[in-house]
């Protein structure tokens, strides 16, 4: 195995996992149990280092977790203590001692060996061998340590160590060491049962000033040490402060400018700088009376938002979710005291309350419920927590217009400013989200309000005391997402000229291309005096495109490398860059040609559809016309029927008969003495009327005759069947039969029911 020689130098125990250098005089002798126990007994740096207590938490299972700032041989560490186990994080590069993490996880020897093989195979590790056994071992980068901690289920235990803001590392003095030891002892004996759950693991408590609980920054004074100027004096830390501590301002470690593959480094006291000392005057100068942000804010390196909490590893998940959800159903959001009373310390405020991973803070920020936001932040909700896509509560708030309607975005920034350096899964900041939302219909004014408020807030608070300057924020505006797009590129692509103007006036660069090589000028957005090409634009573009190379392609150059090797390396990089650029341009050109072809086809289809739409609209108009005509005709018919009904009711046929005294059976005669001479047309009209009446009468007579013939035939058959006489002889015998029936009884005494029944039987027999 590739790591065989490496493994021989270390002992992998079942109960402990430590890397210890073998004595030179006994290269093949394994570590004895006594030596291992000695190493475990001295698992902290108490005897050989300066330690300052930071804070303490209680895990869900009741175990206490303590966080210390440690300085050993001039090197700064953060130490997390959990029972008999410790875990160290090195401050300059955020490397973790992986042996301590595995010992904390209680892994077996086989698991330790497998993990060690993977680390050695990757090559991204550092083997430290010094006179301090607590520091010896294999150190791995931040990302890999996080991955291992999650895989072995100790991520939540290490959360205070992982999320601690290294910019807040304290400076050491003898007085602070004495005070920290006293406070640690008091907290260990009296405060464990009253502290918040593990999610609250910061040592600072936001001070209450101004209406939002955030200091303003007018007349701010400069400080030589921005990182240390936000540490509370250790004498002010008590159990109540620890209970109310918030973890939301602890950020991930800064990204290293150079991450080399380091293997074996020997550390000695002579190679490290002595620790800094802080006198009483300097300690008192850490907190001038000038108002400032409660915690420093750095835009030097951006970090990804925290993922949503996993409900499978959470206790009382459903209880926390139900209580937090019920708060949003309460219409009385203005009562902050009532809200804080509902938010008990046992609740997990970061629990997802919907299927998209949104926490209560996301919803409160989106619906602009400021009292609820203040209560959540005061109780320890983490604004760095994202949803399933990595969107923080601040990002979600700019997707709606509620804060524009209430003019409350400035107050929201005072509460959630700690999440400004966070990015989502696509690498986008809140400025990216503002520009993306500006492309939605009706959201342009809201996006401009959010952007201008954010820029004014950043300008107002830019100070060394707050951890950042305006140039850092301008670099933040120029941050590129995973597609290489800056916020200005997105605003130009969606065509919002107002957002483009605001960003460029704030100092955003218009010459940063995305991965496709497109910048602001390529999107057809032109702002006066803004897109003037600088003289060194070519060099700028080359440098910007070079920065888009992934970190894996960057090669670490030894300090004593010869100049010709450097030139050859640079030439290779430029050649590779040019080849990649040409290949990418060819691929993009092919995509553009394909897009043009699809565009032409889509245009033709659109023309055909428009023609069909025109025909359909014409037919629809005609149909509506015809329907209206039909409606008019039906109305006219109803009116005519109504008039006819009225005439029929007023018609008196008896009056006509009486006046005329006509006999219906009288023959038609022509009055020859009629003095009125009718015209030929009138006579023809009367003749035609008589002919029509005659035709109708003839037709009616024929129908009656045919019907009577059928009836006669049926009756003849009935009589034939009843009398047993041939049907052809019935007519001749009918008179005799009639006399016989009449003589059978008196007139009117014939049983017609029997006759009807008899006729029915005859009919069925015929069928």
UniProtKB/Swiss-Prot annotation:
DNA-binding interval(s): 98-119
PROSITE patterns: ANK_REP_REGION, ANK_REPEAT, HTH_APSES
UniProt entry tagged with the keyword Zinc-finger: no
Motif (Nuclear localization signal): 261-264
Listed Polar residues bias regions: 29-44, 192-221
KW DNA damage (keyword) present: no
Main location, first listed in the record: nucleus
Domain HTH APSES-type: 66-173
Stretches the record annotates as Disordered: 17-44, 189-230, 542-562
TM helices/strands, residue ranges: none
GO molecular function: DNA-binding transcription activator activity, RNA polymerase II-specific; promoter-specific chromatin binding; RNA polymerase II cis-regulatory region sequence-specific DNA binding
Residues that bear Phosphoserine: 252
GO biological process terms on file: cell division; negative regulation of DNA-templated transcription; positive regulation of DNA-templated transcription; positive regulation of G1/S transition of mitotic cell cycle; positive regulation of transcription by RNA polymerase II; regulation of transcription by RNA polymerase II; rRNA transcription
ANK repeats: 356-385, 483-512
Keywords: ANK repeat, Cell cycle, Cell division, Mitosis, Nucleus, Phosphoprotein, Repeat
Pfam families: Ank (PF00023), KilA-N (PF04383)
InterPro entries in the record: Ankyrin_rpt, Ankyrin_rpt-contain_sf, HTH_APSES_sf, KilA/APSES_HTH, SWI6-like, Tscrpt_reg_HTH_APSES-type
Location in the cell: Nucleus
Recorded superkingdom: Eukaryota
Function: Major component of the cell cycle transcription factor complex MBF (MCB binding factor, also known as DSC1), that controls G1-S phase specific gene expression. Involved in the control of rRNA production, via interaction with pol5. May be involved in the transcriptional regulation of the cdc22 and cdt1 genes. In fission yeast, two genes, cdc10 and cdc2, are required for the cell cycle control called start, the point early in the G1 phase at which cells become committed to the mitotic cycle.
PANTHER family: ASPARAGINASE, CHROMO DOMAIN-CONTAINING PROTEIN
Protein's UniProt name: Start control protein cdc10
Organism of provenance: Schizosaccharomyces pombe (strain 972 / ATCC 24843)
